[in-house]
C-alpha cells in the first residue's frame, strides 16, 4: 500500500473513532450515585455526558429537597442533552434546559416532590435508541 494511502486510512480511522462511531450506550454498565446535601440542604450531584451514555446512569436524591445537578459534557463533536420531564413528580428538565455541546458544564435545578423512579434520556436524534438513558431515583 502506498505511504499516502496508509496515512489517509489512519486519518480516517482516527476521525471515526473521535466521532464515536460504533459506540453503544447499552453496553455501558449501570453506575449509581447518591446526591450529597450541602449545609443549606441543597443536594448536589454531577452527571458526565459522554458519547451515548450518562455516568452515572442512576442518580438517587431525596424528595422535597432542592437538587442541583451539574452536567459535564465529555464529547467534543456530538451535541447531547439530558431530558427528564415528570411534572407530577416535580421534575422538569426539558431538552433546552439540559442541552449542551463542546465541553461545557451546565447546572439544572429542580425539587422532586414525589418518590419514584423517573427515566431520563438524551433527546437528540436517535441517542435514546442507542442507549443514552438513565434513572433518577427519588426516595
Each model region followed by its residue ranges:
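Bacterial N-terminal signal peptides that target proteins for export
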Residues: 1-10
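C-terminal motif of bacterial Sec signal peptides marking the signal peptidase cleavage site
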Residues: 17-20
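Extracellular/periplasmic metallocenter environments
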Residues: 23-34, 53, 100-139
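N-terminal edge beta-strand
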Residues: 32, 37-66
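N-terminal post-signal-peptidase region of extra-cytosolic proteins
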Residues: 49-57, 68, 92-95, 103-105
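Beta-strand cores of secreted/periplasmic/IMS beta-sandwich domains, seen most often
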Residues: 57-78, 105-114, 118, 138
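Beta-strand signatures of extracellular beta-sandwich domains
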Residues: 81-85
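Short edge-strand/loop segments of extracellular domains
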Residues: 86-92, 138-139
Amino acid at each position: 500500500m502506498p505511504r499516502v494511502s496508509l496515512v489517509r486510512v489512519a486519518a480516517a480511522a482516527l476521525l471515526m473513532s473521535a466521532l464515536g462511531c460504533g459506540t453503544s450506550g447499552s453496553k455501558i454498565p449501570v453506575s449509581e450515585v447518591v446526591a450529597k446535601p450541602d449545609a443549606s440542604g441543597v443536594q448536589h450531584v454531577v452527571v458526565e455526558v459522554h458519547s451515548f451514555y450518562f455516568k452515572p446512569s442512576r442518580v438517587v436524591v431525596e424528595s422535597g429537597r432542592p437538587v442541583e445537578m451539574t452536567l459535564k459534557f465529555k464529547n467534543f463533536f456530538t451535541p447531547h442533552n439530558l431530558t427528564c420531564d415528570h411534572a407530577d413528580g416535580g421534575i422538569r428538565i426539558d431538552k433546552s434546559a439540559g442541552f449542551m455541546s463542546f465541553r461545557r458544564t451546565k447546572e439544572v435545578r429542580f425539587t422532586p416532590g414525589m418518590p419514584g423512579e423517573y427515566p431520563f434520556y438524551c433527546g437528540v436524534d436517535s441517542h435514546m435508541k442507542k442507549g443514552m438513558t438513565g434513572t433518577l431515583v427519588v426516595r
